[in-house]
Every structure is written in C-alpha cells, then in structure tokens.
UniProtKB/Swiss-Prot annotation:
A motif (Selectivity filter of repeat IV) lies at residues 1321-1324. It is found in: Cell membrane, Sarcolemma, T-tubule. It comes from Rattus norvegicus. The gene is Cacna1s. The lineage of its organism: Eukaryota, Metazoa, Chordata, Craniata, Vertebrata. The modification Phosphoserine is found at residues 393, 397, 687, 1575, 1617. Pfam families: Ca_chan_IQ, CAC1F_C, GPHH, Ion_trans. III repeats lie at residues 786-1068. This is Voltage-dependent L-type calcium channel subunit alpha-1S. Glycans are attached at residue 1141.
C-alpha cells in the first residue's frame, strides 16, 4: 500500500467517526524501520483489526476489574492466600496489556504519523496505565532483591510501589474507549468544562473570601469545652457530642455539676472542623457549601461565642454558595446538553427524518405496549383476511390444485368457524369494557398487595392467599384470550404483552414451587409486586401521561450510558478507596464505622453515599482520622473526597437533571403538538360545517376556538416546537429562528404576565383598574346608585385605603410572630390580644364595606365569587369566632388560633406581582400532576416490595447480645467509652426503628426520606442487618439488600425527582414566555432590543488641568490596574497566612502589613479622587465600594492601635474598668473583628477585573433583580410555617442530645425561621420531624395540665414537615434554578450570537469618542468605532475597510442634519442587523412592524426615542446607509477608470465599450452583502494602489490623505504636539494603535471627518434645486454651507478661481492657474505629517470637495481649531466646461439596477438618491454627463436581449 494522498486525508478528517473503522491508510513506516510489507507488522495489523481481538481485550479488562474488586485490603499490610494469588494474576494481566500496546504500536506507529498510537487520547491513557504497571512490577522485583541482600532494610522501601499500584484502578477507564455511547456523554461533559471552569473560579473565590472572614471572626474560638473539674474527662450529656463552651457572654455555659469551661480541647470532630488557619477554614466552608453538616458548625460557633450574629455568616454562605453558585453548574450542563443535542439534530434532514421516525416508533411502541399490540385492522378481520399463521395462504393454493376433499372441507369449516370466533375474541379483547375490567382486576390486585402488614390477623393472610390465586387465574385467562384473539406473533410484538406474560408465568411458577415445598414463599413474592406495573395500563387513555411516560422511556436510553459512566466512576473510586483506606477504619473507640472501604461491595456503597452527598463529611472525617488526624498526611485525604464529591455530586448527578429537562421539553412539545392537531381538526370540522357563512364569521369562529385553551389556562401550549412546524415555518434556514407561534393572534393579552419571571414584572406598571359597581343590588337594599354604596365604592377603590389595609395586614402578621408560645398568660400576649381586637375590627369593617359595594355572593362580580376574597372572609371569620369562643374547649380555640396565620396571605390579593407568582406556582402544581402520579405509582411499588422484604425486621434490643423480645428484659452493664472502670447499669429495651416497612404507609414514608437523601445510610445498614421477623439484627446479614435501595435512589431520587425539578423549570420558563407569545421576538432579541432602547452613554471624564491630567493618565492606565491587582493578591496572601496561636513576631508583622496595605489603598483612593473629582469618582459603584472599604480599614487600624496601647489594662473594651476576667476570645459583641472584615472585602475588588467572572457577576445581579416577588413568596411561606410551628411545637422542652435543643427550637420566631431554613437545606429534617411528633416532654415553664408532662408535640408534624419540605425542595429552590438557568443560558450559548452581555463593550468604546456623553458622534467615526468592537457586535479590527462600509450600508442608521449619529440609533441598528430583526422584505413595512412590536412590548417607550431609532415612514431621512452606498459606487467607478488610465497611459475620452465595462464592475462590486469579502483580486488592487502613488508623485501634487478611505488626520490636528490620530483617545493607547489599527489590508482607517463630508449631507432638502448655486437661501444657514462659504473666502484670498461646488451644486470649476504658494504649503504640510507605513494617497479622481470643521461650542478639548491654515489641503480640478442639469434616464436606470442587484431596493426606489448618485458619479470620475449617458445607453441596449442579466466582467 502506498501512502495516502493529502486529499484522502482531508476527506478522512471530514468524515464522522464510525464505530466500525474502515481500513485506515497506515503510515508507510512504523518505528522508523518496519514497512507495510514487513511480515511482523502485517501480522500485528491483522490481529489488531480482527474483531474478536477487541472483545478479548475488553473481557480481559473486565476480568482485571473483577480481580481488583476481589482483593481484600487488610490493616498493617497483612496478606492472605487469596491476595497473594491475585498478586500473581496481576502479572498475567500486565503481560496481556503490554502485548496489546506493543502490537498496536507496531501496527500504527508510535507517535509521528497522523494515525499513530499516541495520537488518540484513549491510547495515551492505556499507555500510561500499562507503563506504570510495568514500572511497578520492576520496582517490586528490585525491592525484593534489596530486602534479600539487606535484611535489615526498613519496610518503607515498598511504599512507593503502593502509591503506584493505586494507578491500576484507572484500568476500568479503558472500557470507555470500547463503548461509543459513553464517549458522547463524556464529550458533552468535557465541552462544558470551560464555562464550568468560570464557575469553579467563582466558587473558589467565594470559599476563599468566606474562609478568610471565618478566620478573622472565629479563629481560636472553638478550643474550650466543659471538663470535669480537676480531670481531663469531657463532660457531656448522653447522646451529645462534646461542643465548645464560653465562660461569659451568651455562649454555652457548663450546666453539668462539677464541670468547668476551659481551653486545651482540640476542637469539634477531633479538631478537624475549625477556623484556626486558612486550610481548615476552607475545608469547613466548603463542607458548609455542600449543605452537609453546616448546622453543626453553626451550632458549635453559637456555643462558643453566642447566637446573636454567626447565623448571618452561615445563612448568606448557603444562599450564595449553595443555592446560587452551585445551581449555575446545572445551568451550564443543561445548556451544553441541549446544545449537543441541537447539534446532533442539525446534522441534516436525513437525521431529522430518522429522529421523527424514532419518536413515532417510541410512541407507537409504547402505545402498543399499553394497548397489547393494537395493530390489526378490524375491517380486515370482518372480511376474514386474517391468516392463522404464515402457512395459511399456501393451504388455500393447495386446496385449489387438489380439488375438493372431505378433510379439506372439514378443515375449511373449522377454520371459518375459528376465524369468526377469533374475530369475536379479538373484538372483545379490544373493547373498552374488557379494558376497564382488566383495570379493575389490577386495582383489586393492588389492594390485596397493599393490605399486607406486620402482625396481620390470620384471616387476612388467608384472604390474601386466596385473592392471589384467583387474580392469578384471571390474569392467565386474560393472557390466553389475548394470545388467541391476536395471534402469538401479534401478541408478542408488544413489549407490554411480553412483560405481562413474564409476570403471569412467574406467578404460576411461584405457586407451583411453594405448593411443592421446594422453596420458601418469601423469595419470589417480590415478583408479585412487579404486577403493580400493570397500573401503567391506565395511561392508554390519558395522552399527556402517556407522552410523559414515552419521554421517560426515551430518556432512559440517554441515561443508560450515563449510568454506565456513573458505575465506572464509582468502581474506580471504590477501588482507589480500597487502596487508600482498606482495613484502616479501626479506631480506639468502640463505635463501628459502617461506611468503610474494607471490601469491594462496602466500598461501592460508601462511594455511592458520598455521591448522594448524605453525611459525606463524616466519611471524610473518618478517612482523615485513619491517617492520623488533622496533621500533615491525614489532611491530604480530603482531596480524594472532595474530588469524588465534586465530580459525582455536581457534575454527574446534574447531567441527570440536564437530560431530564431536555427530554421533558420534548415531551411537552409532543403533547402540545397533539393538542394543536386536535384544535386543527376541530377547526376543520367547523369550517366544513359552515359552508354558507362568510369568511369573516368563519375566522371569528376559529378565533374563538383559538382563545378557548387560553381560558382553561393550559400552560403547555406555549411550546410548539415540533418538527412539522419547523419544516413549514422556517423553510429558510434561519440561524436565529424567531419565537413564532403560528395561529395565535389574540390581542387580548393580559396586561401583566402570569409568571415569576422578572423582566415583565419589573417593567410593567401594576395599575389596578377600579372595578365598577355590579348592576344588581347588594343585600337586597342598596341599589347601584345608592349614595352609601357609591361612597363605599369610592373608599374601597382608593389607593390610601388599600395601603392602609396592607399596613394593618403587616402589623397583624408582626403581632402573630411576637407572641410567646410557652407562657400563654404572659404580659406580652395580653397586650397583643388587645391589638388583635383592633386588627379584627379593621378587617371586619373592610369586608363589610366591600360586601356593600360588590354584593355578597348571589350575582356575578360579587364579593364571594373571587377565591382570594373568600380567603379574606375565612381569615376574618376565624378571628371573630375565636374571640367569641374564649372560654370553650381549648383544642378548638387552638386550631382557630393557628388558622390566624393565614393573615399574611391576604397581602397576595393586594400586591399584583405577588399574585402572579402565586398563580404561576399553582399552574406549575397543576402541570406537575402527571409526574406526581407516576412518581407516586413507582414509590408505591417500591413500598410494597419493601413491605415484602422488611416487614417486622427493624426491631432491635439495646443490649445487642439479645435477639428476641422475650430475651430483652431486665438490666445490663455498659462500659462508658470502652473503659472497664466506668460501669453503668441500664434497663434493656426492645426498640422499633423510627422508619420501618411494617405496612405500606410507613414504608412510603421511609422511602420518601430516602428519596430526599436524608438519613438513608442508617436505614440501609438497618436493612442489611435485618434478620427474621421479630428478631434483632445480625451484622452484615444481607448485603444484597443494598441493591433495593440503590435502584430506588437511582430511579426515584436521581431520575424522577430530577424530572420533577425539570418539570417545574420547564413550566416556569413557559409561563415566562407566554406573555410574549405574539410578539415575534424571541427572548434574546427582546433583551438586546430592550438594552439598546434603555442604554445611555457613559461619561468619560478627561481633566483639562495639566497636573490633574497627569494623575488621571496614571490612574486610568492598565499598568496601574495591574499593580493594584497584584497588591490585592498580596493582601489576600497576608490575610491567609494568619493562624491560631501564632507568635508575637507574626502578630507584629501582620499588623504592620495591614497598616501598609491600608495606606496604599488610601493613596489609591486619593489619587482617583484627584483624577476624577468627587462627582466623577462617586459615579462608579466600584469606587463607592472602594471608598467604604478604605474608611473601614482606617477605623480598623485606629482601633487596633488603641487596643495595643491599652493592652496592659485589658484592651479597648476594658476602658470602663468593668472587665475583670473577660476572655477576649468569647466576646460576641461586634468587636474590632467587625472592622477587620474590611480587610477581606478588598478581595471582592478582584471580581471587577476578570472578564468571564465579571460577566457571571453581571448575570448574577440580573437574576437577583428577577427574584423580588419570588423572594417575597418565599418569605411568606417561611413566615406562615414559622408561626404555625411556634403555635404547635413551641412548648416542647429543649433537651440537649435531642434534635430540639438550645440551638434548634420553635420557642422564638427567629429560631423557628432558622430551623425551617435548616429543613429547607435538608439537614436531618426527618430527625426534627420525629422530635416534634407526639409524646415529647413539655417545657417546664409552659402551662400543661397535670399528668400531661409528656403530651407535647403532635402527629400533625408529619404533614407539616413533609409539606414544607416538598414546597421548599421542589418549588422554591427550583424557582432559583429556573431564574438562574434563564439568565445564564448565555454561558453555554454560542458566543457568535449576539447577546445582551456583549452590549456593554459598545458603551465603553463609545465613551472614548463621546467623552461628554452627549449621545452623538460624527458619522465618520462610526466605522472606526465599529472596527474597534469585536464581533458579534462590531466588525473587529481585521475587517477590511470596504466590507465595513458595505455593512454600514445594510445598517442604515438615521443621520442627523449636523452629520452625527445618535447613540441609541447606532446601537439599535447594530442589534437589529446582528440578530436579523425584521431585516428581510420591504424595508418601510419592516420598520412599521418593528415600531408596532416595540410599542406593544415596551409600552412606556417615548415616541421621540422611537423616531430616533426607527424613523417613521414619510420622514425622508438621510441615513448612513445611503451615504456609504453612494460612496461604494463612486469608489468602484474610480477604480475602474484608474485601471483604464494605466492601461492606455492616457485618459480615453469616448470609448463607450470601456465605460460600459466600468459600469458593470460597479454593479458587481457595489453589492453590500456582508459575507462577500473585497471583490476583485487583492493583488490587482495593490498594484493599482502602487501605480496611483507613482502617478501622484509624478504630478508632484499631494492630495488630501483620506477622502473616504484614507486617514483624515488633518482635521484632527490640534495645537498640541500629540499625534493627530488620537484627538479623543486615551494617550496610553498610542503606541499600540499606530500599528494595529492602521493596518487593514487595502485601505487605512478613516478617522473622524467633518460633517459636510458628502453631497448627501442633507438629502432631505428638495433636490430639484440641485443645480442652483450654493447661495440658495434654503441652504444658507446649514453648517455644511457655512463651511463651503468659508472655503470660498479662503480660495479667493489665495487668488484662485472659485469652484462652484457644494453639496448639491454641480462642480463645474472654472479652470485657472494654481498659485505656487499653495503647492509650497502642501509640500510643507506633507513633510510635517508622518505618513504611517504603507499609507497611500487616494485615487486621482477622488471626489474631493474641501470639507471644513465646524466649531461646536462647549466641545472642550475636543473642538477642533478652524483657524489654522495648516489643516487645509486643496485639490486641483481638471477644467470642465458645462454644468449638467440633472441625471439622465439611462444612467438612472443603470444605477437603479446596480442598487437592486446589491439588495438595496429601498434606495433604488428613492429618486432623489439615484439622482444625487448619478451626479456624484459623473462628478467623481471627471466625465461629462453625456459620456456617462452614452455608455449607459449602450450598455442597457446590450443587456436587454439577454433578459436583463448583466454579463460579468471577463
């Protein structure tokens, strides 16, 4: 084989990878010596590409994994025979892998060829693993030899080998390279790495900031605890971990007798959790962010320093860290996932078709699964076409041949009879009745299974047994009937039927086995539960549900590969864990650590536990302790756990969610598409039914139909993104498809969107319209015109009244929160009771007024017809009743008192924004219904299986040696802490676990807690130890039970719960979109347009005072920025270096450094104040932030100085002398530590520097703005639950060692809220639930009845906590996620699509051209401005000049009369062209449509602004587009003429052919398509430019550099010596700009030019008088004309004939002699001006009227000098005789045609414009109009026979 040609290689690269490799073109040589003909290499190639070889290798890898898993790690490096055997086997694997690697290297070459071995990432991984294996083996041998030679050598020599051995665990990764679907999931995860990296930075940043704050605030506070006096024994209560204490202040005092608080304790968690130095501080903070064990840390800090303010630190940490930043991960992953899928989708129509078929197949498969193979057509049956089996037709043909025969006739009769019977049977099976019968049987089956429970009576067991057999028989009959009716082949086509058959057969098998006594009845009874899956049959008649299930099954596919990846990941970490921790989890204390790594199954369970994040921190603490505690080697262990937790919990588990959200959106669109089809059908029927009605009537009917779903409030119809629509609507491949919703044109949009989404709520005005008085009379007395009623109406609808009531609602809520739950008769409660009377009175009056106004409930629009009003009425009624029932039964009053909590809900009716969020939540709950159903079904199924497996098995005795209840009596001894001297006698108790599986309900409860990931390991180990019914546990009795829990967790917790979350997110997103349903702009377009309309230019302050300017120059330079950046980093490092117990010297150094940094930052502030002046300085929020920090730091320095001065008397706080023995460590007063925070805050300044992080922050703040109403709703939820909690659970006594304790209780309102916040983060909420249930001890101060000391708490706790947890976990947190995913979609969006985050750059760069923020710049600055902005918004600096001009033609922004463009108009035009908003079709019409859309969405947009960005029709605006279009046409014509001149060496006068060719060039080249690069050959143009330079030099004339395309720097020259280029730019950029900005390929940048640049500067004046002299009165005052007048005077002075040229006057110059002085002046000027390298003067026939700066007052340093004659350069004109009157028709036609070709129809239609262009054309090329006309006529004549197709230039 010869080496492949480069073409082949190119092709090969393009082709997608196929799983089966085609024969790759192999490198001719491998390893420099082996050619393709070499027999060894041939053999290797054939082996490596032999399919079984791959399989063998995969199997070997698998075997190796098994071997690694079987290995038993032991403490102290002990070994057993199995392990030694495995060590030997290891060599075998090593040899196999080495051979494989060697063969592949020989076959493919090692490194240097394109397809060499090491060029594939997976091969690199393989190679490293094999290499390390071989290396380890060699080292081991060396070690053995060493030990033999030197027997005394230490054991340490083997250590390095052990470390290397750990690399073996990577071998399972090689499976990935064998399984393609895994690579897809991995790829999308890798793709997300970049945005994830930004988030990781943000998280790291947060962790660092919080760690340093923690270090400053809590350093050394955690080292005191209660010791018994005189001993080192820590004093604790039973069940309580030791915790810090405080001698004084509000920390925890030592209450146990004989104990004292003193230091010397290592700290909580054996000294791992503390803030004593930066490292541990970071670990602690990270643990808090993961929301595991954060409350423990908070409680320890509270115990140490009091609970007044530490909660602020922790709650903000959780809110920012966990809820916000970590949810970003989800946003990014789901974005990436969707993007990957979109990519896959857009890979072509074929793919699309395939996918469509796939979806249909899935659905069909699923439907048939449910409908038992509904494939046969009933008509076919009736005609008797059904063949019994394949052979049917053959028999018939046989019968025809052989003639009639008795047997055959019998067979025929029998078959006919059979056919009829089967047909009847088939009909029966398919009938609704049969279906419902089966459903009924399934329901009975479900009942019989669900009724099983522990200790059930015998008769029930007997009944269940009988029922089981009867039902089994019924199911068997059903199965046989189906088989008969449908035929076997048809029956087994449906998956559901196969499944059914399997269940029935297993049931029969079970009965046979049990009857014959071959097995115990339990084992297989799990199969009975699988029957419950039949419940899914219900979905057949429930489309949305069936779609949901179809989408679930669909996503199971994508999830299968993810599960495989997850499993691989777990295996690797489990094996690594065994290598690291195997056999090491044996500690001094007697407690057994269940989550360990001592064998493979256990290691897998531990890894899985860390993945779910439940209690992962305790597993980590054990790991650290196993390696000697919180000292050097031990701490490194946390790296393993953190990597495992991050990769597993954040990345892999979020991919689950991403897949779920993605598939759900699909399911939604399926459902809505079906709905749409149904609508369509209805519509068709209606239009069929109305043949005689007029069109209008019909359309109104359909309109009504369309509005109908709206009334029902179905939220799902918002997304109709189904393939059919895509194919119809977006035929043109539009890269930005607009969110078009076909068929919905209702105009009755609600004023306010029904969504929690922000934008609208922020913008729309929440005006409440007064409801008119209803027609009917109220209370049968007051007629609508009654004076009293009218007065009531006026009062009720007054804003002051609403606000007054709102105020009272707030006050009454506050009163509820202030009540004392324990002492009912306290003074406070009595006062509050009087207030209560007042509130009730006010609310009653309000309701009476409203009822008087609107009537009670008998007619439409009356008071009680509104749900919110009924709520009001209920609340008031409850208050009134409870006042009346003071004396009677306490329980009733108690319930009524609790109901008062609903008062805050009345605010919902008053605040509109809140009302919409609430409605949205309700909509979400309604749509979630289906998912809840599916989840509940699955949960129920698992609960039934759990009952079968574990009923009655969760009992135990506290004396572990006793196994049954009978034995568990009397007393037993216990040794405290394993110390034989401390003996205690305890009574034995037979304990039932709190969560158990004794009946279906408690099983569902237990499983629910498992699905929230709380406390599931405890339950799991209980299940693993479970033994027989009613006996105690046996350690690790049934490890296989873990499978049940793991499957449940994966299916329910990972999958269903995520789908749940996904559903909420999708619903919210849709709700947000509904209100924009008909506005044709998608979300991104809306945001960008909104930005463009609302943005205002920034002021860019440049001082005039030279000294101040120097300071400003320094402060704004990038070097200064970098210096400050470095200083902040240094400051951070210094802060991080502090630690507990540091030396005096260290203290001294850190104080000095602090002072130094404070001084430096103060200096920075002073310099900036000087540079920007206070007004400019405080205009920037970052500066304000800096200012506050500096002030705080100064206070901090002063305080610490005073403190050191007063150190002798005990520091600052002992000035009063009352200090005595205060320990400064314990003071929780906001001491100097508070001011120390300012040191840390400097860090935050770093955020303003990093680009990616800054964008993140920007979006962050945007999503905060989006949350106000959501936040309000959350506050309300917490408030209501907290008050209920205080009423219901406030009396429970606080007992240390239980969950209701000093830190966690319902006794005050703040405590209750904190407890609820803890539940919302899921911290052991199920423990709190149990601690609040009935039978708890009451608080001694509460008023319980005698004998009811243990009657506190209530079983209402179950409903309370579960409802709260569900609301929080599923709705509230998801609101966060939804808002975040909404705002952060830009992170993963294609960056080439313009988004709102790109638009800030425009503001910043505009400010440099418009430092005064006037909002206008010269239109010639626009090109340079846009070339400085990077795409997608600008053109970027590499955009060739002509392309930039062509783009400007397309943008078409309005040009003001003074030649400037406005800020908003420019930005709007940019956004509009970049996002293709209404750019197609008729331009004026598009403009009108866009105006209408803007008016509709942003109702408050001022008309002035709107006219500025989109000029109204009929406003004959000059636009930048027209301007540049003229330019391009002239430019090309000139170019062509120049080429002609070069060619002939002189100027051809009347050669029409040539001129026609020239015009043709114009047509071709003036087209403004953006995507076309510079037309024509670049090299030709360069030559042309060179020729032009030479020509110019010969003539000895230097023309004005620039014109349109050069550097118009002469107008920028200022009196100072700065290079002219930079009139308005930051001096710092000079150096860079000279080269970079001036190097576009052909032309150079144009810099700001003067307003009168172009003949079109005022095209909206009447062009009919274009031939009138410039002196015409209508023009006299325009700046352009003043400039021309000025020029004329100058010319006259110079003694030169006046050229009559002005914007619209014809340039018929009178010939004259050029004065010598002028040439001198030009030459002088030329020598003065440095010409940048490569700059060329423009072409000789440049259109060049002299343009002059107009002096604008107030421009400050920017106004240009009009006095200096230096800044003029003149152009000589070739004499010309006649002034032409107007453009001739042929030229007009030609120009129009050229414009149309270029896509500028709107300009072609503009007669004035065409005329001006014609004039400019003749003018520019110094030709007679007649010459142009002749050429044009000739050209058009030639064109016409060809049908107008203009020939291209040859």
């Amino acid at each position: 084989m010869e080496p492949s040609s480069p073409q082949d290689e190119g092709l090969r690269k393009k082709q997608p990878k196929k799983p089966v490799p085609e024969i790759l073109p192999r490198p001719p040589r491998a390893l420099f010596c082996l050619t393709l003909q070499n027999p060894l290499r041939k053999a290797c190639i054939s082996v490596v590409e032999w399919k079984p070889f791959e399989t063998i290798i995969l199997l070997t890898i698998f075997a190796n994994c098994v071997a690694l898993a079987v290995y038993l790690p032991m403490p102290e490096d002990d070994n057993n025979t199995l392990n030694l055997g495995l060590e030997k086997l290891e060599y075998f694997f090593l040899i196999v892998f080495s051979i494989e690697a060697a063969m592949k290297i020989i076959a493919y070459g090692f490194l240097f060829h394109q397809d060499a071995y090491l060029r594939s990432g997976w091969n690199v991984l393989d190679f490293i693993i094999v290499f390390l294996g071989v290396f380890t083996a060699i080292l081991e041998q060396v070690n053995i030899i060493q030990t033999n030679t030197a027997p005394m050598s230490s054991k340490g020599a083997g250590l390095d080998v052990k470390a290397l051995r750990a690399f073996r665990v990577l071998r399972p990764l090689r499976l990935v390279s064998g399984v393609p679907s895994l690579q897809v999931v991995l790829n999308s995860i890798f793709k997300a790495m970049l945005p994830l990296f930004h988030i990781a930075l943000l998280v790291l940043f947060m962790v660092i900031i919080y760690a340093i704050i923690g270090l400053e605030l809590f350093k050394g506070k955690m080292h005191k605890t209660c010791y018994f006096i005189g001993t080192d024994i820590v004093a604790t209560v039973e069940n309580e971990k030791p915790s810090p204490c405080a001698r004084t202040g509000s920390g925890r005092p030592c209450t146990i007798n004989g104990s004292e608080c003193r230091g010397g304790w290592p700290g909580p968690n054996h000294g791992i959790t503390h803030f004593d130095n930066f490292g541990f501080s970071m670990l602690t903070v990270y643990q808090c962010i993961s929301m595991e064990g954060w409350t423990d840390v908070l409680y320890w800090v509270n115990d140490a320093i009091g609970n007044e303010w530490p909660w602020i630190y922790f709650v903000t940490l959780i809110l920012l860290g966990s809820f916000f930043i970590l949810n970003l991960v989800l946003g990014v992953l789901s974005g990436e996932f969707t993007k990957e899928r979109e990519k896959a989708k857009s890979r072509g129509t074929f793919q699309k078709l395939r996918e469509k078929q796939q979806l249909e197949e899935d659905l069909r498969g699923y439907m048939s699964w449910i409908t038992q193979g509904e494939v046969m057509d009933v008509d076919d049956l009736r005609e008797g076409k059904l063949s019994l089996d394949e052979g049917g037709s053959d028999t018939e043909s046989l019968y025809e041949i052989e003639g009639l025969n008795k047997i055959i006739q019998f067979i025929r009769h029998w078959r006919q009879w059979n056919r009829v019977f089967r047909w009847k049977c088939h009909d029966l099976v398919k009938s609704k009745v049969f279906y419902w019968l089966v459903i009924l049987i399934v329901a009975l089956n479900t009942l019989s299974i669900a009724s099983e429970h522990h200790n059930q009576p015998l008769w029930l067991t007997h009944l269940q047994d009988v029922a089981n057999r009867v039902l089994l028989a019924l199911f068997t009959i059903e199965m046989l009937m189906k088989m008969y009716g449908l035929g076997l082949r048809q029956y087994f086509m449906s998956i559901f039927n196969r499944f059914d058959c399997f269940v029935v057969c297993s049931g029969i098998l079970e009965i046979l086995l049990v009857e014959s006594g071959a097995m115990t009845p339990l084992g297989i009874s799990v199969l009975r539960c699988i029957r419950l899956l039949r419940l899914f049959k219900i979905t057949k008649y429930w489309t949305s549900l069936s779609n949901l299930v179809a989408s679930l099954l669909n996503s199971i596919r994508s999830i299968a590969s993810l599960l495989l990846l997850l499993f691989l990941f777990m295996i690797i970490f489990a094996l690594l864990g065994m290598q690291l921790f195997g056999g090491r989890y044996d500690f001094e204390d007697t407690e057994v650590r269940r989550s360990n790594f001592d064998n493979f199954p256990q290691a897998l369970i531990s890894v899985f536990q860390v993945l779910t994040g439940e209690d992962w921190n305790s597993v980590m603490y054990n790991g650290i302790m196993a390696y000697g505690g919180p000292s050097y080697p031990g701490v490194l262990v946390c790296i393993y756990f953190i990597i495992l937790f991050v990769c597993g919990n954040y990345i892999l588990l979020n991919v689950f969610l991403a897949i779920a959200v993605d598939n759900l959106a699909e399911a939604e669109s399926l459902t809505s598409a079906q709905k749409a089809k149904a609508e369509e059908r209805k519509r068709r029927k209606m239009s069929r039914g109305l043949p005689d009605k007029s069109e209008e009537e019909r359309s109104t009917m359909t309109k009504k139909l369309e509005q109908k779903p709206k009334g029902e409030g179905i939220p799902t119809t918002a997304k109709l993104k189904i393939d059919e629509f895509e194919s119809n609507v977006n035929e043109v491949k539009d890269p930005y498809p607009s969110a078009d919703f076909p068929g919905d044109d209702e105009e009755d949009e609600p004023e306010i969107p029904a969504s929690p989404r922000p934008r609208p709520l922020a913008e729309l005005q929440l005006k409440e319209k007064a409801v008119p008085i209803p027609e009917a009379s109220s209370f049968f007395i007051f007629s609508p015109t009654n004076k009293i009623r009218v007065l009531c109406h006026r009062i009720v609808n007054a804003t002051w009244f609403t606000n007054f009531i709102l105020l009272f609602i707030l006050l009454s809520s506050a009163a509820l929160a202030a009540e004392d739950p324990i002492r009912a008769d306290s003074m406070r409660n009595q006062i509050l009771e009087y207030f209560d009377y007042v509130f009730t009175a006010v609310f009653t009056v309000e309701i009476v007024l409203k009822m008087t106004t609107y009537g009670a409930f008998l007619h439409k629009g009356s008071f009680c017809r509104n749900y919110f009003n009924i709520l009001d009425l209920l609340v008031v009624a409850v208050s009134l009743i409870s006042m009346g029932l003071e004396s009677s039964a306490i329980s009733v009053v108690k319930i009524l008192r609790v109901l008062r909590v609903l008062r805050p809900l009345r605010a919902i009716n008053r605040a509109k924004g809140l009302k919409h969020v609430v409605q949205c939540v309700f909509v979400a709950i309604r749509t979630i219904g289906n998912i809840v159903l599916v989840t509940t079904l699955l949960q129920f199924m698992f609960a039934c299986i759990g009952v079968q497996l574990f009923k009655g098995k969760f009992y135990s005795c506290n004396d572990l040696s006793k196994m049954t209840e009978e034995e568990c009596r009397g007393y037993y001894y216990i040794y405290k802490d394993g110390d034989p001297t401390q003996i205690e006698l305890r009574p034995r108790q037979w304990i039932h676990n709190d969560f158990h599986f004794d009946n279906v309900l408690s099983a569902m409860m237990s499983l629910f807690t498992v699905s929230t990931f709380e406390g599931w390991p405890q339950l799991l180990y209980k299940a693993i130890d479970s033994n027989e019914e009613d006996t105690g546990p046996v350690y690790n009795n049934r490890v296989e039970m873990a499978i049940f829990f793991i499957i449940y967790i994966i299916l329910i917790a990972f999958f269903m719960m995520n789908i749940f979350v996904g559903f909420v997110i999708v619903t919210f997103q849709e709700q947000g979109e509904t209100e924009y349903k008909n506005c044709e702009l998608d979300k991104n377009q809306r945001q960008c347009v909104q930005y463009a309309l609302k943005a205002r230019p920034l002021r860019c302050y440049i001082p005039k005072n030279p000294y101040q300017y120097q300071v400003w120059y320094v402060v704004t330079s990038s070097y200064f920025e970098y210096l400050m950046f470095a200083l902040i980093m240094l400051n951070t490092i210094c802060l991080g270096m502090q630690h507990y117990n540091q030396s005096e010297q260290m203290n001294h150094i850190s104080d000095i450094l602090n002072v130094a940094f404070t001084i430096i930052f103060t200096l920075e502030m002073i310099l900036k104040l000087i540079a920007f002046k206070p007004r400019g300085y405080f205009g920037d929020p970052w500066n304000v932030f800096d200012f506050l920090i500096v002030i705080g730091s100064i206070i901090d320095v002063i305080l610490s100085e005073i403190d050191t001065l007063l150190a002798s008397s005990g520091g600052l706080y002992c000035l009063g002398g009352g200090c005595g023995n205060v320990d400064p460590d314990e003071s929780a007063r906001i001491s100097s530590a508070f001011f120390r925070l300012f040191r840390v805050m400097r860090l935050i300044k770093l955020l303003s520097r990093a680009e990616g992080v800054r964008t993140l922050l920007w979006t962050f703040i945007k999503s905060f703005q989006a949350l106000p109403y959501v936040a309000l709703l959350i506050v309300m939820l917490f408030f209501i639950y907290a008050v209920i909690g205080m009423q219901m659970f406030g009396k429970i006594a606080m007992v240390d060692g239980t969950q209701i304790n000093r830190n966690n209780n319902f006794q005050t309102f703040p405590q209750a809220v904190l407890l609820l916040f803890r539940c919302a983060t899921g911290e052991a909420w199920q423990e709190i639930l149990l601690a609040c249930s009935y039978g708890k001890r009451c608080d001694p101060e509460s008023d319980y009845a005698p004998g009811e000391e243990y009657a506190c708490g209530t079983n209402f706790a179950y409903y309370y906590f579960i409802s709260f947890y569900m609301l929080c976990a599923f709705l509230i947190i998801n609101l966060f996620v939804a808002v975040i995913m909404d705002n952060f979609d830009y992170l993963t969006r294609d960056w080439s699509i313009l988004g709102p985050h790109h638009l800030d750059e425009f503001k910043a760069i505009w400010a440099e051209y418009d430092p005064e923020a006037k909002g206008r710049i010269k239109h010639l600055d626009v090109v340079t401005l846009l070339r400085r902005i990077q795409p997608p918004l600008g053109f970027g600096k590499f955009c060739p000049h002509r392309v930039a001009c062509k783009r400007l033609v397309g943008m078409n922004m309005p040009l003001n009369s003074d030649g400037t463009v406005t800020f908003n108009a420019t930005l709007f035009a940019l956004v509009r062209t970049a996002l293709k908003i209404k750019t197609e079709g008729n331009f004026e019409q598009a403009n009108e449509e866009l105006r209408a859309i803007i008016k509709k969405i942003w109702k408050r947009t001022s008309m002035k602004l709107l006219d500025q960005v989109i000029p109204p029709i009929g406003d004959d605006e000059v636009t930048v587009g027209k301007f540049y279009a003229t330019f391009l046409i002239q430019e090309h014509f000139r170019k062509f003429m120049k080429r002609q001149e070069e060619y002939y060496g002189y100027r051809p006068k009347k050669d029409t052919v040539q001129i026609q060719a020239g015009l043709r060039t114009i047509e071709e080249e003036a087209a403004p398509e953006i995507h076309r690069a510079i037309s024509g050959d670049l090299t030709a143009e360069e030559e042309l430019e060179r020729a032009m330079v030479e020509a110019a030099m010969e003539e000895g004339i230097f023309r004005r550099t620039g014109g349109l395309f050069g550097q118009v720097d002469n107008f920028l020259e200022r009196t100072n010596s700065l290079p002219p280029v930079m009139a308005n730019q930051r001096p710092l950029q000079f150096a860079e700009m000279e080269m970079e900005e001036l190097e576009s390929p052909v032309f150079l940048e144009d810099f700001p030019q003067n307003p009168g640049t172009h003949p079109l500067a005022r095209a909206n004046t009447n062009n009919a008088n274009a031939n009138v002299a410039y002196g015409n009165s209508s023009h006299r005052n325009s700046p352009v004309f003043s400039s021309i007048r000025y020029e004329r005077e100058l010319l006259e002075e110079a003694g030169r004939p006046v050229t009559r040229e002005g914007p619209f006057s014809q340039p018929c110059s009178v010939s004259g002699v050029n004065s010598r002085s002028h040439v001198d002046k030009l030459e002088r000027q030329m020598s003065q001006r440095r010409m940048p390298k490569g700059q060329v003067p423009p072409s000789p026939c440049q259109l060049s009227q002299e343009k002059h700066p107009v002096h604008e007052e107030g421009k400050g340093p920017r106004s240009w000098s009009t006095e200096t004659s230096d800044s003029e350069s003149f152009e000589e004109r070739v004499p010309r005789n006649s002034a032409h009157k107007c453009t001739a028709p042929a030229t007009t036609m030609l120009i129009q045609e050229a414009l149309v070709r270029g896509g500028l129809d709107s300009l072609a239609a503009d007669a004035n414009f065409v005329m001006a262009t014609g004039q400019a054309l003749a003018d520019a090329c110094q030709m007679e109009p007649e010459e142009v006309e002749v050429a044009a006529t000739e050209l058009l004549k030639r064109e016409s026979p060809k049908g107008g197709a203009m020939p291209r230039e040859p």
